Amino acid sequence: MHSRALVGCAIGVSLAPGVPSRAAPPEQVVIRGRAACLDDAGQRRAAGAACDDHPSGGWALEGEGGALHRLSPEDTRVAMLGDVRVRSHELQIVAWRYDDGRLAIVHLYTVIDGKLHDPYYYCPICAIRTHAPGPCWCCGRPLEFHDPPLEGASGPAP
């Protein structure tokens, strides 16, 4: 009897006007462009300015018309942009766009000769595959970089 009353009360509260509901889920987007390192003000660094592994203003994807799509600094896949073997190519990302405009990468692909490639780092000793460059967190050896093509993929990522 008490459980029915609690369920009824919970339903009534969740449907009551003025009670905020959960935030809408983020929008999934597919964006093609080039990696852009940002300065402290969040602006694209001047042409010719060197991008290091961790630019002070973070990373963005520069899409059509020069639009900057800012990438979330908490996103672990953003570390791949510190590798010139990744950022030197056109990129395609599948990402969640949150209400504040930041993007969280779901998939990151390089575009080479019009075909999508799937970059990653691998330790053959420990059989660890990751999207963050650096030493293997198990054995400490350098990770190998791989960028194989996706079979038959040239358009938006699957």
Put a short name on every predicted segment.
Residues 8-16:
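Bacterial N-terminal signal peptides
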Residues 96-101:
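Short, charged beta-turn/beta-strand-edge "cap" motif at the junction between a beta-strand
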Residues 1-8:
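N-terminal export leaders
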Residues 19-23:
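Sec/Tat signal peptide C-region and signal peptidase I cleavage site
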Residues 75-92:
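Short nucleic-acid-contacting surface segments enriched for D/E, G, S/T with interspersed K/R
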Residues 106-158:
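Cys/His-clustered metal-coordination modules, chiefly Zn-binding fingers
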Residues 25-55:
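Structural detector for short beta-strands of small beta-barrel domains
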Residues 47-71:
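OB-fold (S1/OB) nucleic-acid-binding surfaces
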